[in-house]
């Protein structure tokens, strides 16, 4: 058996490692997992087929797999105060797919946040499986505040009388009132599902309200702010447990990825610590520090600021450049972010009027408020003065900041 990584793969791996070490990562959905999670992702568990659930497998030799998955299930339930947990979904999208299957029939009506307002593809976008399987109607944000308008959401729900309401977003920077969503759902007898993929780590840390208190089903990814192996997780009330499990296997998936389930379990255990609670608090502090610097230097923030881990910046109205161009400028100096639509955007999705910035990854590396103030000033300078001389100077500042907060020093491929 070959024991060496292919030379071309090794070369790319080492270049990617160097990129991660030397760049400031501000993509809101990215993070740096612990070396324990990395090790588990590449463990011998990848060899094992384990269709089914702990104690009810369709393959032999699963006793140790069962131990790990059972630990993950129990940890998820305790961490999020859930009656039931399924940690097998391969992704957040597949978690959402299974949640829909557990609650709905094809063509049932759903009300969710529109993609242009900050929602997600799996919340009914027409060319996504969700959009062509179910009958979605959408709510957005108030045009003046760019925040959720619960009175307007209630009117939309009363008009369309959905079977399911989806709360949650991929680009919304304010606290979501899950209690209010539950009250609205109850008025039409609808189920409430919350997609907390972006904020799960903040919920675990106690710095964002826990949707499990109000929702029938909660879905999430296990990476992003939760800082785990890539994958999905479903939490629900006990009355939906059987339907959820059946919707995942055999409804949506076959064999679970037990190496990633081990990585998820490790991350859930890490998220149960006091250290992680402090991490969650620091994410929010860092976001506010970055937001303040950007605002003080004339950049307009969508919704007026942030309560969580991300900031949506309206680049077009303040600097007359697209989000795509801003993304490329920042990447040229070693700051990685993504172009992003903003509410009521007039630009096409490939160009956008905004960029989305997130603090989780660099908070993992040890950045605090002072470092994020520096990052904010670098961003402003790069976008306002795109001269080669200035960008070269700023790129050196980025490298200097990264060198003060090293990551994965012991890894070499």
From Swiss-Prot:
PROSITE patterns for the chain: SHMT (PS00096)
Molecular functions per Gene Ontology: glycine hydroxymethyltransferase activity; pyridoxal phosphate binding
Alphabetical keyword list: Amino-acid biosynthesis, Cytoplasm, One-carbon metabolism, Pyridoxal phosphate, Transferase
Gene3D superfamilies the UniProt entry points to: Aspartate Aminotransferase, domain 1, Type I PLP-dependent aspartate aminotransferase-like (Major domain)
Principal localisation: cytoplasm
Coiled-coil zones: none
Any Gene Ontology biological process: glycine biosynthetic process from serine
Keyword Transferase on entry: yes
Record's subcellular location: Cytoplasm
Gene Ontology CC terms, in alphabetical order: cytosol
Cofactor(s) essential for the protein: pyridoxal 5'-phosphate
Subunit structure: Homodimer.
Protein name per its UniProtKB record: Serine hydroxymethyltransferase
Gene: glyA
């Amino acid at each position: 058996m070959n024991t060496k990584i292919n030379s071309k793969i090794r070369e790319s791996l080492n270049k990617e490692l160097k990129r991660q070490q030397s760049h400031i990562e501000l993509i809101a959905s990215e993070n740096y997992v612990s070396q324990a999670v990395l090790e588990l992702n590449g463990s011998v568990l990848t060899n094992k087929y384990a269709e089914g659930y702990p104690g009810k497998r369709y393959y032999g030799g699963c006793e140790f797999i069962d131990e790990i998955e059972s630990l993950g299930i129990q940890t998820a339930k305790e961490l999020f105060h859930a009656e039931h947990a399924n940690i097998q979904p391969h992704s957040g999208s597949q978690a959402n797919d299974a949640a829909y299957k557990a609650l709905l029939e094809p063509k049932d009506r759903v009300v969710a946040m529109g993609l242009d307002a900050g929602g997600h593809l799996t919340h009914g976008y027409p060319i996504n499986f969700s959009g062509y399987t179910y009958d979605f109607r959408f709510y957005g944000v108030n045009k003046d505040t760019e925040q959720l308008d619960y009175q307007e959401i209630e009117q939309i729900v009363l008009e369309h009388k959905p079977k399911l309401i989806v709360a949650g977003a991929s680009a919304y920077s304010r606290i979501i009132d899950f209690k209010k969503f539950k009250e609205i759902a109850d008025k039409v007898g609808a189920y409430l599902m919350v997609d907390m993929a972006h904020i799960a780590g903040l919920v675990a840390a106690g710095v964002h309200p826990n949707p499990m208190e109000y929702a029938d089903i909660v879905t999430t990814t296990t990476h992003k702010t939760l800082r785990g192996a890539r994958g999905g997780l479903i939490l629900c009330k006990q009355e939906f447990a059987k339907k959820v499990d059946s919707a995942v296997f055999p409804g949506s998936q076959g064999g679970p990825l037990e190496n990633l389930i081990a990585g998820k379990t490790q991350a859930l255990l890490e998220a149960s610590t006091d250290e992680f609670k402090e991490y969650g608090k620091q994410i929010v502090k860092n976001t506010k520090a970055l937001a303040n610097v950007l605002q003080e230097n004339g950049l307009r923030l969508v919704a007026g600021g942030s309560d969580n881990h991300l900031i949506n910046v309206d680049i077009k109205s303040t600097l007359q450049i697209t989000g795509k161009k801003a993304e490329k400028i920042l990447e040229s100096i070693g700051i990685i972010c993504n172009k992003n639509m903003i509410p009521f955007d007039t630009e096409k999705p490939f160009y956008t009027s905004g960029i989305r910035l997130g603090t989780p990854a660099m908070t993992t590396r040890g950045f605090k408020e002072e470092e994020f103030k520096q990052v904010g000033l670098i961003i402003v300078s790069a976008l306002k003065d795109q001269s080669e001389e200035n960008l070269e100077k700023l790129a050196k500042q980025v490298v200097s900041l990264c060198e003060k907060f090293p990551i994965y020093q012991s890894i070499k491929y």
